[in-house]
Amino acid sequence: MTELEYKQPLRIGVGGPVGSGKTALLEVLCKALRNKYQIAVVTNDIYTQEDAKILTRAEALDADRIIGVETGGCPHTAIREDASMNLAAVEELAKRHKNLDVVFVESGGDNLSATFSPELADLTIYVIDVAEGEKIPRKGGPGITRSDLLIINKIDLAPYVGASLVVMDQDTKRMRPEKPYIFTNMKTGKGVPEILTFIETAGMLNI
């Protein structure tokens, strides 16, 4: 591989509302995958690089494997209509680490209608959390219905917010038939092995 050549990594878009646990998920995934694969992360924040700093402080990856993009304005635009800043960040990481296997692209906090441009993400993971209420899956939206994997996070909070995981499970099955979803708790690691299996299988990393 010459200096100008580099591997095209698998690009995984990670979206979801503010506070749903996207950054915590990325920390867990990076730590679980980094000894097996070459990993990097692009984070999106409107005016800061806070999520990039959080991942760096948590030592999820070396600092040169994390790029924080300051999107300004609407975070949806940076992952959909004009993904140029994110595409440039992915390319920069791929050039910097020529054998990258995976680049995670974390969106800024978005709503249920946000989607990743197919030019930017090969696979999409959408994260919602139980604290938003059991009605979230049935509200639908592209994040719920079209993502390759839906993660329903913070299941430990269900008793405190009056959310029924049974109802959420039924609604999710109805809203995304045939598409996978996983109930998770990042604090205990519940659901993490299933997420890793999905990434390796759907991303064809283990071929």
From Swiss-Prot:
It is found in: Cytoplasm. GTP binds at residues 16-23. Keywords: Chaperone, Cytoplasm, GTP-binding, Nickel insertion, Nucleotide-binding. InterPro entries: CobW/HypB/UreG_nucleotide-bd, P-loop_NTPase, UreG. One of its GO terms (molecular function) is nickel cation binding. Its main location: cytoplasm. GO terms for biological process: urea catabolic process. GO terms for cellular component: cytoplasm. Pfam families: cobW. It comes from the Bacteria. Homodimer. UreD, UreF and UreG form a complex that acts as a GTP-hydrolysis-dependent molecular chaperone, activating the urease apoprotein by helping to assemble the nickel containing metallocenter of UreC. The UreE protein probably delivers the nickel. Facilitates the functional incorporation of the urease nickel metallocenter. This process requires GTP hydrolysis, probably effectuated by UreG. Belongs to the SIMIBI class G3E GTPase family. UreG subfamily. This is Urease accessory protein UreG. It comes from Shewanella halifaxensis (strain HAW-EB4). The lineage of its organism: Bacteria, Pseudomonadati, Pseudomonadota, Gammaproteobacteria, Alteromonadales. The gene is ureG.
